[in-house]
Regions:
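A glycine- and Lys/Arg-enriched "phosphate-lid" helix/loop adjacent to the NTP-binding pocket
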Residues: 95-160
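Hydrophobic anchor at the beta1->P-loop junction of P-loop NTPases
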Residues: 5
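The conserved Walker
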Residues: 9
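Glycine-rich phosphate-binding loop used to anchor ATP phosphates in small-molecule kinases
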Residues: 57-108, 123
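Conserved glycine(s) of the Walker
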Residues: 12
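Conserved substrate/cofactor phosphate-moiety recognition/catalytic segment
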Residues: 22-63
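Hydrophobic positions on the alpha1 helix immediately C-terminal to the Walker A/P-loop
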Residues: 16, 20
């Protein structure tokens, strides 16, 4: 079981996944984009999304695919903080290549995708996220259109406490007793 949690930047995805990992014991794969930005800012080279969006999206796509393959042997559920769909959506937007072409032959996630809505009260720009809330909304709307077109069923997270969100996710995915 490979579950994708995606949606609006600053929607609380990473914090929610931290709860699912630490409190509920699930394996979690961290967001590829943030890992890439940290590496570049640390001097490891590579593309930043605000300087080279196509190069960044290509790197995020490769990292997301490597992440998926790295946990392919794990039989327990695994949660992904963003992933192939996010990177492919960004690459399609910035390059004009159809997303279906980008994803052709790449692994898929489980049909139900957890979708974080825009949450302005949580959104913060920082050294790793330089874009503003308007850009985050545009990305959210692109993902909202792409998911059903690719055959995924998105389930929108409620704007509730972290523990209530974690319970909602587990219930929505049938992972509770």
């Amino acid at each position: 079981m490979r579950f994708l949690i995606t949606g609006c930047s600053g929607g609380g995805k990473s914090t929610l996944l931290d709860v699912l990992h630490k409190k509920h014991g699930f394996d979690v794969v961290p967001e590829p984009g943030r890992r890439i930005v940290r590496a570049v800012l640390a001097g490891e080279g590579g593309a930043l999304p605000w300087d080279d969006p196509v190069g960044f999206a290509l790197k995020a796509l490769a990292l997301a695919e490597a992440d998926w393959k790295a946990v392919s042997h794990v039989s327990a559920p695994v949660f992904f903080d963003r992933g192939l769909i996010d990177a492919a959506s960004a690459l399609a937007f910035h390059s004009g290549t159809p997303i279906e072409t980008i994803l052709d032959g790449r692994p898929c996630y489980d049909e139900t995708v957890i979708f974080a809505p825009p949450w302005p009260e949580l959104f913060v720009s920082d050294a790793e996220r330089k874009h503003g809330f308007d850009d985050a909304l545009q990305e959210f709307h692109r993902l909202d259109a792409v998911l059903p077109a690719l055959g995924y069923r998105s389930v929108t997270l409620p704007k509730t406490s972290l523990e209530e969100r974690a319970t909602f996710v587990l219930d929505a995915l049938g992972l509770t007793c």
